[in-house]
């Protein structure tokens, strides 16, 4: 089903299923002999969602190589592991710099407030759909997981007035903040909503604040991209999952996040997927392994 303004989803459908896919990839990466990252909460969260293909991937029942070939997404597990590690390292650097206020927008099934070692005095704010927040909180509570920082959750759609809800939860715009928008600005919001998100973050960011995100579009409407999306969608359907990649993203020219932040006074550094693989110690992607994420950019920024 094509995305529309104000649409809704859960973790088993539409864009929500991509959050479950990413968590399943983190669980699969955690099982490897020398994992790029360790996320012990990914598998129980994926199991609780109940999508068969992702449960099998997370549990080790399904060979990642077989799945990646079938859906046309080479090195999918490595890609999401490298991305996750990139942002884990970003938060570690922010903590060492003295930042004690963190905001994760559209957090999905990410469990960083539980799995990372945060400096004493850190408060983490998570923003996502109310149903997603409730599901994740309840699932982690059932398995006895406890946050490693003070955690405050805000159940609200990013297309609504989330800045007011964030401040109502105790967020202090006078304090430096480490922001993360992982997997958000890659076509899952309308272009105008991307701009609103960035324009809302800047005035809430004191000097010394940091921002990290990936950006671009998984489906740029080119013939090659359209064909890739078709093959991937057919692959997921063969695995019993109705996830139409092209229909998940909004059309239009999406935001150059680094340029937008730079114009607003942020000092930005951009990276490609190859940089993330190198930083994680993973073998580089071959020409044949260039998948949907290879066209994305990654940014880290500091507010001066």
Swiss-Prot record:
Leading EC class: transferase
UniProt record, GO biological process: methylation
Keyword line: Methyltransferase, S-adenosyl-L-methionine, Transferase
Gene Ontology molecular function: methyltransferase activity
Record flagged with keyword Cytoplasm: no
Gene3D superfamilies according to UniProt: Vaccinia Virus protein VP39 (3.40.50.150)
Entry-linked InterPro entries: Ppm1/Ppm2/Tcmp, SAM-dependent_MTases_sf, SAM_mthyl_Trfase_ML2640-like
Residues binding S-adenosyl-L-methionine: 128, 157-158
Keyword Disulfide bond: no
EC number, as in UniProt: 2.1.1.-
Function noted in UniProt: Exhibits S-adenosyl-L-methionine-dependent methyltransferase activity.
UniProt similarity note: Belongs to the UPF0677 family.
Name assigned to this protein: Putative S-adenosyl-L-methionine-dependent methyltransferase MAP_0882c
């Amino acid at each position: 089903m094509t995305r529309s303004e104000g649409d809704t989803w859960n973790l088993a459908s539409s864009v929500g299923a991509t959050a479950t896919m990413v968590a399943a990839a983190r669980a699969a990466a955690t099982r490897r002999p020398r994992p790029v990252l360790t996320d012990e909460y990914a598998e129980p969260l994926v199991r609780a969602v109940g999508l068969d293909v992702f449960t099998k991937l997370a549990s080790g029942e399904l060979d990642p190589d077989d799945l990646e070939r079938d859906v046309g997404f080479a090195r999918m597990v490595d890609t999401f592991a490298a991305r996750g590690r990139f942002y884990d390292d970003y938060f570690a650097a922010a903590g060492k710099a003295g930042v004690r206020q963190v905001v994760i927008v559209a957090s999905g099934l990410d469990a960083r407030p539980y799995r990372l070692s945060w400096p004493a005095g850190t408060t983490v704010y998570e923003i996502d759909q109310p149903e997603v927040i409730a599901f994740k909180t309840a699932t982690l509570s059932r398995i006895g997981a406890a946050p490693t920082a003070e955690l405050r959750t805000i159940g609200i759609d990013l297309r609504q007035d989330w800045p007011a809800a964030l401040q109502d939860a105790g967020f202090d715009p006078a304090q430096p903040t480490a922001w993360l928008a992982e997997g958000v600005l890659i076509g899952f919001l309308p272009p105008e909503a991307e701009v609103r998100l960035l324009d809302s973050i800047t005035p809430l960011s004191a000097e010394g604040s940091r921002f990290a995100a990936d950006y671009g579009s998984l489906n740029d409407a080119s013939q090659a991209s359209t064909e890739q999306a078709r093959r991937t969608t057919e692959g997921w359907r063969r695995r019993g999952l109705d996830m139409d990649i092209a229909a998940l993203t909004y059309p239009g020219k999406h935001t150059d996040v680094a340029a937008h932040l730079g114009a607003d006074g942020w000092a930005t550094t951009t990276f490609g997927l190859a940089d993330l693989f190198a930083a994680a110690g993973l073998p580089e992607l071959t020409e044949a392994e260039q998948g949907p994420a290879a066209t994305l950019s990654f940014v880290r920024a500091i507010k001066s």
